[in-house]
Amino acid sequence: MIKIKKGLDLPIAGAPVQTIQDGPAIHHVALLGEEYVGMRPSMLVQEGDQVKKGQALFEDKKNPGVLFTAPASGKISAINRGERRVLQSVVIEVEGDEQIPFEHYAAEELNQLSDEQVQHHLLTSGLWTALRTRPFSKTPVPGSRPRAIFISAMDTQPLAADPQVIIATESEAFNHGLTVLTRLTDGKVHVCHAAGQAVTRHTNTQVTYNEFSGPHPAGLVGTHIHFLEPVSQTKMVWHVGYQDVIAIGKLFTRGELCTDRIVALAGPQVNQPILLRTRLGASLSELTAGKLKEGDNRIISGSVLSGTAFSATHGYLGRFHQQVSVIREGREKELFGWVMPGRDKYSITRTTLGYFFKRKLFAFSTDMHGGERAMVPIGNYERVMPLDILATHLLRDLLAGDTDSAQALGCLELDEEDLALCTFVCPGKYEYGPVLRDILTQIEQEG
């Protein structure tokens, strides 16, 4: 077992009850193009076309053969593009339940499948896009093989669902998915779970189980990779979400594309935080209708630390998100707030009274409590960074754009979510995730 000591479990109110309920009917779903790093789409459909679930919508020009398929049947109601015609979203108005059938196999045949068979099946169904590489967090190139594959069967994000509750409902499909993944690598398939949890073991010795304990980010795949299979420019691993492993298992044994998604709807502004069964790419406005407290709320696809805020073109459940968080918009001004004791304000330093209430849960809002200022190294980053990385030095070099030094300090091991806590505790209010992405893109382009 690997014990994480540094980190932070955000004391936010509105944690979900770990019970699964059916969500409301969803009438609009979408694929969000900007979730796929470096992807350049070649469109295969246009607005007004009727599509079936599993039908290809577009192909990646940079990765020929990588198809992005429809998560539901219906009509293409909108194809939204941003600046320089960057694809933002492809919106489908859900109609019926027609789907593309795929080849399927008996459970005992899965171990005999070739690498080429598995890759072809994942590519044609669109489930290949559930895989991501580390470094760079991109969709893998068809034909490549990773040193290892990681599945995080734990989640320490604030307000997250317990993965074991969800996996328990589809344990057979989950194990079938693990069997399929073993065909894609000569290395280990790492299943990382919380310490003390009872996990059904796979019979294939290629599948290994690793226990992690401690505060967030103990549940992040970046943490697991760092301690088990550190990556570099010459060593690549893949990772995939636990619900996508279930979908892979169902694809190969039933011949159907499963786009179900169980998400935690939680946060201080949710009336009854709970787990909801919905579908991939679901409209967030439809998913949360009638479930939120009145007021000016911010709906976030994903975690409050690293999720994507609701907007007209991005108002849908993200491909890699397992939760929907809702907090209050902090637009109001507080008179002489800087001299108040701050009983209801959380801080990791002794700057507010809230620091001393260790068991108190706070109704966080979007208020930043101050504007951007110079980066001040007072030890906050080191408190929440459990990886063997010089946090302050790395963050400084990211802001300075020093790719050589950032690479030497370990930036290739990181993704945006790995620096979310550093952003949260930063006295200077810097957003380190986008800066990291710019540096990673520059490193990749320069070789």
Curated annotation (Swiss-Prot):
Which superkingdom, per the lineage? Bacteria
What the protein does comes down to:
NQR complex catalyzes the reduction of ubiquinone-1 to ubiquinol by two successive reactions, coupled with the transport of Na(+) ions from the cytoplasm to the periplasm. NqrA to NqrE are probably involved in the second step, the conversion of ubisemiquinone to ubiquinol.
Organism of origin: Yersinia pestis bv. Antiqua (strain Angola)
Asked if the keyword Flavoprotein belongs to this entry, the reply reads no
Write down the InterPro entries for this protein, in alphabetical order: NqrA (IPR008703), NQRA_2nd (IPR056148), NqrA_C_domain (IPR022615), NQRA_N (IPR056147)
Q: How does this chain assemble?
A: Composed of six subunits; NqrA, NqrB, NqrC, NqrD, NqrE and NqrF.
Q: Please name the top-level EC class of this enzyme.
A: translocase
Which family is annotated? Belongs to the NqrA family.
Catalytic reaction list: a ubiquinone + n Na(+)(in) + NADH + H(+) = a ubiquinol + n Na(+)(out) + NAD(+)
Q: Name one GO molecular function term.
A: oxidoreductase activity, acting on NAD(P)H, quinone or similar compound as acceptor
* PANTHER family, A to Z: NA(+)-TRANSLOCATING NADH-QUINONE REDUCTASE SUBUNIT A
Spell out the NCBIfam families in the cross-references: nqrA (TIGR01936), PRK05352.1-2 (NF003759), PRK05352.1-4 (NF003761)
Cite the EC number: 7.2.1.1
Q: What name appears for this protein in its UniProt entry?
A: Na(+)-translocating NADH-quinone reductase subunit A
Q: Which of UniProt's keywords are assigned here?
A: Ion transport, NAD, Sodium, Sodium transport, Translocase, Transport, Ubiquinone
GO BP field: sodium ion transport
